[in-house]
Every structure is written in structure tokens, then in C-alpha cells.
């Protein structure tokens, strides 16, 4: 039997989401891709920076997820910013609907990765940070960095 690939298979990250939101829960979901989008994503041509997800008619869609057209794709390329359906179980969609019906909650894709040769999206239930929360997080990060430097210099 072949060994499972234990490498980091992350194809795209949304690091800005960790800065702009408090992440409450995460869900793993498949994504419906067409044409040459898989090849383009595997080449690292995906961007999750301003992406979000919405629930419409009992289905979850990823919006503003930019997948650049595949270079050799010619007529099979599709719109780079099209809405892509995310594949979740009905019970998971109902949970997400419960979260997003509350004020301040949103769905944010935070990672695109490969799992068993399939492209998956890590979808997070998130609450937006206020500006003072962002400043506090930066101060905390700087303090942690200073402590690590001091510990390293004392060795």
C-alpha cells in the first residue's frame, strides 16, 4: 500500500482573515471546480484575500475567490471571480445558517489545500474585529516577539 502524503499541501492561505476576524469554528468542504481551474489552483494561482462565502437556496457559495485562468487553457477557461459552490452536508449547512443569521457572523474561506488529490476549502465561521482589537493583537504579537528575542540572546 502506498504511503499517505503527509506534506503540507496548502495551495493558498487567507492570512488577512486571521488579522480581520476572530475565528470561531472551521469546516472542511469540497469545492465544485470546472474546466482548467484545478490545474491553475495546483500551480498556486489562487487568491483568497477578499473572499467570503454566502448561503443561498440551501447551498454555500464562495464569492470573490480569484482563480487565475490556466495559461494553456484557451477556450476551457472560465471567469476568474465566478461564484463556486462549496460541498457540505445538509446538517453542516444548517449549522452555518444558524451562525450567519446572528449579527456580526460571516463565513470566510481561510485555506485551499489538497486532500487525497482533491481540492478542499477550510471554511471558517468568523466575527469581525474592531480596530482596537487589531491594535491589541499587534501589540501582543510584538511583545511575544521581543520575549522570544530576549530568550534567544540569553542562551
From Swiss-Prot:
It is found in: Cytoplasm. Disulfide bonds: none annotated. CDD domains: SmpB. InterPro entries: SmpB, SsrA-bd_prot, SsrA-bd_prot_CS. Gene3D superfamilies: 2.40.280.10. Its main location: cytoplasm. Signal peptide: none annotated. GO terms for molecular function: RNA binding. Pfam families: SmpB. The keyword Iron does not apply. Belongs to the SmpB family. NCBIfam families: PRK05422.1, smpB. This is SsrA-binding protein. It comes from Clostridium acetobutylicum (strain ATCC 824 / DSM 792 / JCM 1419 / IAM 19013 / LMG 5710 / NBRC 13948 / NRRL B-527 / VKM B-1787 / 2291 / W).
Amino acid at each position: 500500500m502506498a504511503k499517505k502524503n503527509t506534506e503540507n499541501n496548502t495551495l493558498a492561505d487567507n492570512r488577512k482573515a486571521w488579522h480581520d476576524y476572530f475565528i470561531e469554528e472551521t469546516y472542511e468542504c469540497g469545492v465544485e471546480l470546472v474546466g482548467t481551474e484545478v490545474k491553475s489552483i495546483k500551480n498556486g494561482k489562487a487568491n483568497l484575500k477578499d473572499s467570503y462565502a454566502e448561503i443561498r437556496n440551501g447551498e454555500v457559495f464562495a464569492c470573490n475567490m480569484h482563480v487565475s485562468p490556466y495559461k494553456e487553457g484557451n477556450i476551457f477557461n472560465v471567469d476568474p471571480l465566478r461564484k463556486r459552490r462549496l460541498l457540505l452536508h445538509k446538517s453542516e449547512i444548517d449549522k452555518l445558517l444558524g451562525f450567519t443569521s446572528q449579527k456580526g457572523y460571516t463565513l470566510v474561506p481561510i485555506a485551499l489545500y489538497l486532500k487525497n488529490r482533491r481540492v478542499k476549502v477550510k471554511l471558517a465561521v468568523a466575527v469581525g474585529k474592531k480596530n482596537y482589537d487589531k491594535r491589541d493583537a499587534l501589540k501582543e504579537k510584538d511583545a511575544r516577539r521581543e520575549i522570544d528575542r530576549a530568550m534567544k540572546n540569553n542562551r
